[in-house]
Amino acid sequence: MWMAAVAGALVLIVGLFAYHRYSLQQTEKKYPPDGEFVTVEGVKLHYISKGEGKTVVFLHGGILTGNDFRDAIDLAAEQGYRAIAFDRPGYGYSERPKNKRVTPRDQVRLIHGALRQLGVQKPVLVGHSWSGTMTLAYALDYPDEVSGVVLLAGAMYKEGYPAERGDLISQLVTNPVIGDLFLHTVIRSPLGAALTKLTLTHTFAPEPIPEGYREATLAFWLRPGQFKANREDVLAFVPAAKEASKRYREIRIPLIIMVGENDPFGTKEQAHRLKREVPHAKLKVIPGVGHMIPQNHPELVMRALGALSE
C-alpha cells in the first residue's frame, strides 16, 4: 500500500514539474523580451529605453517588471525625456546573482554599473513601492550622480512593512530544499493562481486591475526564479530599510514623495515621516488613488516629474 502511495506521489511530482517546464516555455513565447541587455559583474540585465533628452530611470516594485512603467515610458518619451526601465535583478528577463542573498544595495550597485555602461549621467530616479528604499539608497550612495528622486507609493521604513514581523511564505520559498520543490511543482498550479488573484486584488484596491495585468502576473510572477527573487526581496527589505533610514536626513537632492490617499499598505504614513526627515521634499497625497500609481495613473508619474523643477 505504502509503495503505491509513494509511486503515486512521485508521478504527481514529475507531472507537475513537466507542466511547469511547459508553462514557462509558453510564457517566453507569449512575452518575449522587448528591450536590450547590459551585463554588469557577470549579471545580464534587461532594460527598455525610449526617447531622447534628460534621462529618467524607472525602478519597479515587487510583482512584475520594468513594463509596469510602459505607459509612463511612452509619456516621458513624448515629453522629451530619455526613459529607461530596468527589470530588477531576478525579475522579467534580468538575471540575479547566484549563490548569495541579494540585498537592495547589491541591486543599487548593479543598476549603477549598468547606467555607467549606458553613458547615463545624473538621471532622475523614479522608484515605486518596494523600490522606495532602494532608490533612496542609490541617491545616498551616489549623491553627485543623481539629479532628483521621485517616490511613488514608496516603502522606506521597516515599521509598518508587511513582513516586519516575519513572512512564512517567504521563509518557505527561500528554503533551499522545500522551497525549490514548491517553486518547481506547486507555484504554477491552481494554488498559485489563487495566490495571484488574492495578491492583486489587495494590491490594486480600491482601484481596478488593468486589462491584461492579471495574465502577465500569472506568466511572470509565478516563474520559479522571479517568485523566489520577490520573496528574497521581501525578507531583505526590513534590514535594508532599517540601515538606509538612518541616513535619510542626509538627502540634499530634489525629492518628490507621491502617495495615494487610499493606499492600503501604510505608505502614506511613511511618506509623511520621510517629509519630516527631509523637509525640502515635496509631498503630494493624491485623493482617490491606491498603491499602483504607475499602472493606473501614468499621468501622475509625469506630474511628479514636472514637480521636480517647480
Please report, for each region that a protein language model flagged, where it lies by residue.
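Active-site loop/oxyanion-hole signature of alpha/beta-hydrolase fold enzymes
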Residues: 40-42, 48-50, 85-126, 303
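Acidic catalytic loop of the alpha/beta-hydrolase fold
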Residues: 236, 261-266, 291
